[in-house]
């Protein structure tokens, strides 16, 4: 089976890229071949295909004209098309529409995974008509949370009638996330063994990540713990003057910069922060739970779905609760073991290949090309 997975960008540390990489591995575990196609790649594979029109050449600019010939060829030469958020955002609506048009023309079974429907974020481009997110009932639409499922069902009930709308929570590599090197990563960051490291995996230019709120929590925790607390923002970019820069200037023991392996990030951290105002899912919450680290997150609405799966997440207002946990080794072990067990039960990538095969079959049924 030849699969083409398309996204705006691939290979980065952002949530969509990480989730897309998991699906690529899942398809390949089935013995299927996967071609990655994107407007921009942060890494490289030999068979990658750049699709003009999906990604702007300069920040803030409009995307270049859509490369219809390449999109048509990809649709005609693959057995399954996966649009991973490429049909969800207003960042490149003409490319999204072209992907849907050529997929329908070629009759290729298509899975459209929606991480961030356009109305849930900042409107980047004007869109006329009912175009984005894509919602054709001959394609299988996979949303990553129940919240978005209800929104899609209300807007396009025909998707329910066609059985073309499903929920699949993003999975994580539970075993891989437990392989981080705590000592080596902390040494590279310049963190002493007795310091409390708060890791915040976030982009400095993403307002929803609430960096000022994360710094406020770090300062409050530093005020009640006896040892030194350090705040680690993984994005090294300087950012613009304003509230974020002002907050970072007050961050305790500030550290900036990525590490290549997520497992090392979580191994190094004592607490993971994600006090976002909005997340489509919040992958670091689940990754931290899988890695056995306490996570402080919210109050974004979808977090309730992660908690409902049995994952304990601390509220940013509960500084005392986090401080007490860090001071009680027995409670720390018990709660975090329960968190890891909840992730293993419901959100492990071990089950992903079989789930992807099922999604592919459902997409074939919608297209009328059952094998």
Where are these regions (language model features)?
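Conserved donor-binding/catalytic core segment of Leloir-type glycosyltransferases
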Residues: 5, 191-209, 215, 219
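A short, active-site helix/loop in glycosyltransferases that binds the activated sugar's phosphate group
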Residues: 121-164, 172-176
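A short helix/loop element that forms part of the nucleotide-sugar donor recognition site in Leloir-type
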Residues: 127-130, 177-191
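Nucleotide-activated donor-binding/catalytic signature segment of Leloir-type glycosyltransferases, i.e.
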Residues: 235, 241-260
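Aromatic "clamp/platform" in nucleotide-sugar-dependent glycosyltransferases that forms part
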Residues: 277
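Short hydrophobic beta-strand element within catalytic cores of glycosyltransferases
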Residues: 285, 294-298, 313
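A charged, aromatic-enriched C-terminal amphipathic alpha-helix characteristic of glycosyltransferases
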Residues: 317, 330-363
